[in-house]
Swiss-Prot record:
The keyword Nucleus applies. It comes from Arabidopsis thaliana (Mouse-ear cress). The gene is PRN1. Signal peptide: none annotated. Keywords: Abscisic acid signaling pathway, Acetylation, Nucleus. It comes from the Eukaryota. This is Pirin-1. Induction: Up-regulated by abscisic acid (ABA) and low-fluence red light, but not by low-fluence blue light. Contains one cupin domain that is not required for interaction with the G protein alpha subunit. The keyword Nucleus applies. Disulfide bonds: none annotated.
Length: 287
């Protein structure tokens, strides 16, 4: 991959291990982004790797004020809402959901073995009450490129001359890289954007600088300022797979409470009231 010689490399400023935790009955999660990192990682609100048994899942629940990206790594989940939208997200598929002013949906596993990731992306105040919508991409529809031992799936943004067709209300890059043993990649990222990586597989990934220590799976790696993210796979036997995620900061107050992401506590209170009274985007809560 080519890049400008005057590029400014982004170095690692923080790394966090997403520890395995139980959540409810039959679900296990790894929380990669929590409230403590929301200011540092603006516009990103939450990142969770999840797996749940056939007896588990998430019955009808509301959302408002953000977009969610669900990316299945293994198995599948069945998604539906009271308006009749229903679909199954299989391994390699993506659902990009704009909750906007209000959406109610459920998510249940299709198979006993399933594993996926969900990212929440904040919306600016001017977009928080937009109409909800879904964009679903099958694995076959996601553009990809391969070069010098590096494969990338371009879910949002662009890489290796390939551009995703997905429109994101908050400008976002979402790339799934797999580096064969001994390979490296250098990805340009807009200088003003926030950028981080989440390692899915591998134990000898070097991020930001060749002088950095190797980082293993299930870590979130946060990058500092610059316009170039460099990654090396130092393993001689194992591939390195990671998500590179970047986005334009919004720079507004963030108040998250449960399924709602707004700008103030008053707006959070209003969201709960609207849901409980089935109004202002949550009319289907009556069903």
């Amino acid at each position: 991959m080519t890049y400008e010689n005057n590029s400014v490399p982004r170095i690692v400023i923080k790394k966090v291990l997403a520890k395995l935790e139980k959540e409810g009955e039959g679900a296990v999660v790894r929380n990669g982004i929590t409230k403590i990192d929301q200011k540092l990682l603006d516009p990103f609100v939450l990142l969770v790797e999840f797996s749940f048994s056939l007896s588990a899942g998430f019955p009808d629940h509301p959302h408002r004020g953000f977009e969610s990206v669900t990316y299945m790594l293994q198995g599948g989940i069945i998604h539906k809402d009271p308006k009749g939208h229903k679909g199954t997200i299989q391994a390699g598929d993506v659902q990009w959901m704009t909750a906007g002013r209000g959406i109610i949906h459920s998510e249940f596993p299709e198979e006993e073995v399933n594993n996926g990731l969900q990212l929440w992306i904040n919306l600016p105040s001017t977009e928080k009450m937009t109409e909800p919508k879904y964009k679903e991409l099958s694995s076959l529809d996601i553009p990809r490129a391969e070069e010098n031992g590096v494969e990338v799936k371009v879910i949002a943004g662009d890489s290796m001359g390939i551009k995703s067709p997905v429109y994101t209300r908050t400008p976002t890059m979402f790339l799934d890289f797999t580096l064969k043993p001994g390979s490296q990649t250098h990805q340009t990222v807009p200088e003003s954007w926030t950028a981080f990586a989440y390692i899915i597989e591998g134990d000898e990934g070097v991020f930001g600088s060749l002088n950095s220590s190797a980082i293993s799976a299930h870590h979130v790696v946060v990058f500092g300022p610059g316009d170039l993210v460099s990654v090396w796979n130092k393993s001689t036997s194992r591939s390195l797979r990671f998500l590179l995620i970047a986005g334009e900061p919004i720079g507004e107050p963030v108040v998250q409470c449960g399924p709602f992401v707004m700008n103030s506590q008053a707006e959070i209170d209003m969201a709960f009231d609207d849901y409980q009274n089935a109004k202002n985007g949550f009319e289907m809560a009556k069903c």
